[in-house]
């Protein structure tokens, strides 16, 4: 029972990111050649090329969109939009911000529910990521780091991490070099989270990074990560399995909960549940690489260590409404799916904080809802990003869906 005399305790999510602004433009091959950019690849460019590239795009009026980016930044924004609640973003921010600058653009495009008070000030620019799209739709990425990788370990607030519902990091944070301190800062936060039993959520971000050393990433996940988010390409890179269900299953060897977005195939989730808490689905059993894999999808996911007799549970949701008629943007769909999963995880922590004696918490579950419910929610949230241009939601989901009412289809 809820104690109404006391003030409700709040739960929140913390994320670490390279603070970056996404700049999108349409270009041709000659433009890529001029700036020595390899088509279809992601490459880091120095500040001179960055400034020349940006000036050229501005001069020729080629920029289509300029908005706040970053995998974890997008996830925090979307979490706060869906949950209408606080998240905390850690990273760097330019100390002096001019109106109209990239840093200004980042602040403007981030939900007011995202707490930016813990950002570390730096004397210089934040990151810029150019997405250059040619006439065939192929995307070429050019990244200018600025000072985005200069988050210091001492800027990580231990108490903030220890009281979080989850800590969200991305694989990009491990790609620092020279005098950049982002990797050390991230590992400091991960250590605080691991020691305090706070779930660490890793989003893989790009297959190219994982392909360089899949064994290292598998070991990292095994040692530090509780929830893994990936798409089918990243799943193939880290597990060696092309089938998203088998990739998610393999990842369960190392972690407790897996989210795998698989484009037009929809979304797969895999997790553990104790045999005594398993719940059979009421939906038809699905065929696949694992026969009847969704049998226990009505179960709530648990950490493997909390299970006396762990069994694996899987769920799959096909694209909402069959997928959008036209996909405006695939960038950020996975981030939005993860934000929905985090919303459910945080709701569970919130309920536990305020209604600790609820029968709901006799099962030490990680999530409030079943795998099937979360999979549907994550799938629905990612659809919202696919039909708009920005990877960031501008509003939460509707309370009721017209398309779920029979009358909608009778029209």
Language-model region placement:
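Ribokinase/PfkB-type carbohydrate-kinase core domain
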Residues: 1-42, 63-67, 71, 86, ...
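Active-site gating loops and adjacent loop-to-helix segments of metal-dependent hydrolytic enzymes
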Residues: 35-59
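Glycine-/proline-rich flexible loop or hinge segments
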Residues: 52-63, 82-90
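Active-site alpha-helical elements of protease catalytic centers
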Residues: 66-88, 335-339
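Short, threonine-centered small-residue motifs that mark membrane-proximal processing/anchoring sites
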Residues: 328-331
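The catalytic Tyr-X3-Lys active-site helix of short-chain dehydrogenase/reductase
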Residues: 333, 337, 374, 378
């Amino acid at each position: 029972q809820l104690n109404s005399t006391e003030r409700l305790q709040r739960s929140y999510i913390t994320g670490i990111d390279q603070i970056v602004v996404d700049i999108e433009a349409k270009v041709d091959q000659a433009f890529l050649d001029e700036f020595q950019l390899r088509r279809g690849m992601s490459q880091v460019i120095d500040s001179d090329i960055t400034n020349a590239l940006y000036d050229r795009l501005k001069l020729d009026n080629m920029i289509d969109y300029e908005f706040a980016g970053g995998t974890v930044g997008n996830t925090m924004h979307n979490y706060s939009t869906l949950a209408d609640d606080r998240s905390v973003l850690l990273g760097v921010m330019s100390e002096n911000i001019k109106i109209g600058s990239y840093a200004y653009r980042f602040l403007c495009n981030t939900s007011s529910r995202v707490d930016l008070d813990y950002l570390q000030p730096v004397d210089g620019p934040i990151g810029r990521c150019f997405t250059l799209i040619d006439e065939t739709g192929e995307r070429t990425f050019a990244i200018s780091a600025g000072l985005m990788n200069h988050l210091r370990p001492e800027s990580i607030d231990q108490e903030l991490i220890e009281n979080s519902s989850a800590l969200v990091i991305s694989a990009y944070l491990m790609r620092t070099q020279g005098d950049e301190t982002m990797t050390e800062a991230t590992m400091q936060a991960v250590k605080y989270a691991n020691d305090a039993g706070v779930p660490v959520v890793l989003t893989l971000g790009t297959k190219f990074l994982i392909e360089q050393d899949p064994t290292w990433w598998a070991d990292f996940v095994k040692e530090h990560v509780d929830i893994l988010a990936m798409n089918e390409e990243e799943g193939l890179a880290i597990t060696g399995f092309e089938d998203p269900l088998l990739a998610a299953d393999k990842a369960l060897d190392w972690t407790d909960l897996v989210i795998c977005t698989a484009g037009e195939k929809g979304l797969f989730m895999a997790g553990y549940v104790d045999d005594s808490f398993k719940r059979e689905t009421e939906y038809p059993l699905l065929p696949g690489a694992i026969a009847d894999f969704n049998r226990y999808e009505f179960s709530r996911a648990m950490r493997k260590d909390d299970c006396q007799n762990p069994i694996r549970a899987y769920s799959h949701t096909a694209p909402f409404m069959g997928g959008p008629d036209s996909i405006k943007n695939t960038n950020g769909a996975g981030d939005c799916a993860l934000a929905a999963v985090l919303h459910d995880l945080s709701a569970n922590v919130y309920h536990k904080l305020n209604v600790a004696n609820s029968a709901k918490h006799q099962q030490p579950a990680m999530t409030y809802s079943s795998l099937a419910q979360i999979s549907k929610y994550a799938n629905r949230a990612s659809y919202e990003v696919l039909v708009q241009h920005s990877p960031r939601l501008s509003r939460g989901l509707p309370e009721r869906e017209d398309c779920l009412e029979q009358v909608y289809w009778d029209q």
